């Protein structure tokens, strides 16, 4: 395979990883916003470190924009969360620059170091651009740049680097509206038909696992009867549910990791 094809393949894999991460992050934010206590994914705990779980649940406004076109820079994600804590308002604007890693065993490689330096430059430029484009106003906004390394397989967070926050003042509502208007990617909304299809698929997988477990049980009974006929007294071994458990764990992993 030529070098150009390898680069094109790596680009496609990275792009696919980005869109998957966007979908998962938006889903997790939406679940927390709806008040599902168990939906606070550990992925959010790392990303939203300046805020607490309660802060996110009590958010009065959450705005998420992906692939935001700011001219010279296009940050992967800009998330604005406005909360009310003990009567005092708090607004945090997260700028997420995502770097996908095909091989996640070692985070300290020349390639990842190059990605790190590039990401830092992108974040600094993005902070300056957001400060320039923020409409005039009295709202206090804490801009928090985040450089996130994520594995292409599993979407596991490998490293999150947070630059020092920068406080700016402006019109929060107009800023959020502007960022949404210049966003170039919107996570797809699954239709009711698609959700039902996924639900049926999960039920089908579970039924196959149960049939496999029953088959193992019947095989164990047959083996016991053969041993008994030969005069061999062996205890009946219960069928292993490892296959069923593995499938269920895989399903859980699909929903927890996107």
Curated annotation (Swiss-Prot):
Pfam families named among the record's database cross-references: Herpes_UL24
Disulfide bonds listed in the record: none
Keywords assigned by UniProt, alphabetized: Host cytoplasm, Host Golgi apparatus, Host nucleus, Late protein, Virion
Membrane-crossing residue ranges in chain numbering: none
InterPro entries: Herpes_UL24 (IPR002580)
Subcellular location: Virion; Host cytoplasm; Host nucleus, Host nucleolus; Host Golgi apparatus
Principal subcellular localisation of the protein: virion
Gene Ontology CC annotations of this record: host cell Golgi apparatus; host cell nucleolus; virion component
Induction of synthesis: Expressed late in the infection cycle.
Superkingdom to which the source organism belongs: Viruses
Protein family (similarity comment): Belongs to the herpesviridae UL24 family.
Functional note: May participate in nuclear egress of viral particles. Plays a role in the dispersal of several host nucleolar proteins including NCL/nucleolin and NPM1. Since deletion of host NCL/nucleolin negatively impact on nuclear egress, UL24 supposedly acts on this process through its effect on host nucleoli.
Entry protein name: Protein UL24 homolog
Annotated source species: Varicella-zoster virus (strain Oka vaccine)
UniProt lineage: Viruses, Duplodnaviria, Heunggongvirae, Peploviricota, Herviviricetes
């Amino acid at each position: 395979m030529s070098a150009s094809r390898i680069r094109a393949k790596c680009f496609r894999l990275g792009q696919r990883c980005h869109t998957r991460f966007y979908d998962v992050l938006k889903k997790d934010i939406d679940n927390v916003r709806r008040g599902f206590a168990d939906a606070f994914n550990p992925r959010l705990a790392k990303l939203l470190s300046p805020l607490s779980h309660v802060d996110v649940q009590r958010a009065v406004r959450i705005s998420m924009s992906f692939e935001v076109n700011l001219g010279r820079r296009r940050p992967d994600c800009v998330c604005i969360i406005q909360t009310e804590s003990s009567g005092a308002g708090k607004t945090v604007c997260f700028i997420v620059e995502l770097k996908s890693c095909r091989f996640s065993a070692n985070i300290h490689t020349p390639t990842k170091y190059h990605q790190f330096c590039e990401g830092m430059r992108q974040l600094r430029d993005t902070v300056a651009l957001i400060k320039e484009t923020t409409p005039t106003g009295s709202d206090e906004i804490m801009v928090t740049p985040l450089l996130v390394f994520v594995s292409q397989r599993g979407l596991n967070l490998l490293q999150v680097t947070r630059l020092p926050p920068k406080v700016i003042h402006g019109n929060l509502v107009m800023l959020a509206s502007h960022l949404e208007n210049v966003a170039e990617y919107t996570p797809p909304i699954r239709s009711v038909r698609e959700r039902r299809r996924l639900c049926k698929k999960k039920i089908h997988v579970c039924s196959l696992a149960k049939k496999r477990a029953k088959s193992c049980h019947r095989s164990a009974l047959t083996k016991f009867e053969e041993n008994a006929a030969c005069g061999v007294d062996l205890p009946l071994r219960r069928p292993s549910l490892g296959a069923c458990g593995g499938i269920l764990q895989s399903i859980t992993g699909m929903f927890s990791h996107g």
